[in-house]
Amino acid sequence: MTEQISAATLFLTTDYRMELHTIHTGLFKLDGGAMFGVVPKALWQKQIPADANNLCTWAMRSLLVEHENRLLLIDTGIGAKQSDKFFSHYHLHGDMSLKSELAKRGFGLEDITDVLLTHLHFDHVGGAVERRSDGVLEPTFPNAQYWSCERHWQWAMNPNPREKASFLSENLLPLETSGQLVFVPREDRWNRTAFDQRFPGLEIFFADGHTE
């Protein structure tokens, strides 16, 4: 099982003022059976209908957190650097992009101070790295620290065959070599952990697999 930082339980106190913005980064399609597993199709298709090929449409969203002079982006969407074949395979659509959605709120890529990656599947971390005009891959946010979990990072760098397609080295290696990657300290597995002193009141916990 994969280990990830659960973004679902990040905001646990209300003693500090934070402004939250939903950032839409596009839509894509995945097989409904693969996503819902043992849940019968008769149940899940009532909420998320599938097309003729059993594909369901999924939204990719990031969360932007404003606190004092810090801008924290939680997840980055699929990004724009992959091949047309890759995007066609996952039926990427929608006119939203990370850069344009941030610009609508008055922010540029250089304004982001922190990026928290809940886990390292390509639809969550792809936008963390961009491809320059000369083909070189580099972090999308030049002034940001990128936060992840060391144990999950090692898993993503050495995945099992079943998960290999979800972890792309081009999304990870440029962060590791840039010097911008930081690991969130992991304490007791089931205890909440303070994220960073610059975001007081912001806590996380570690979970195996996807969470709600």
Name the predicted role of every residue range.
Residues 125-127, 205-212:
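Active-site glycine- and acidic-residue-rich loops that bind
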Residues 48-53, 134-135, 204:
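Short, P/G- and charge-enriched loop/turn segments at secondary-structure junctions
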Residues 4:
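Cationic, low-complexity basic patches in intrinsically disordered or flexible, solvent-exposed regions
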Residues 12-13, 19, 25-105:
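Conserved beta-strand hairpin/beta-sheet module of binuclear metal-dependent hydrolase folds
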Residues 72-74, 116, 146:
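Residue-level marker for buried hydrophobic side chains located in beta-strands
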Residues 125-136:
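Metal-dependent catalytic neighborhoods of phosphoester/phosphodiester hydrolases
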Residues 93-96, 101-107, 111-123, 140-206:
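Metallo-beta-lactamase
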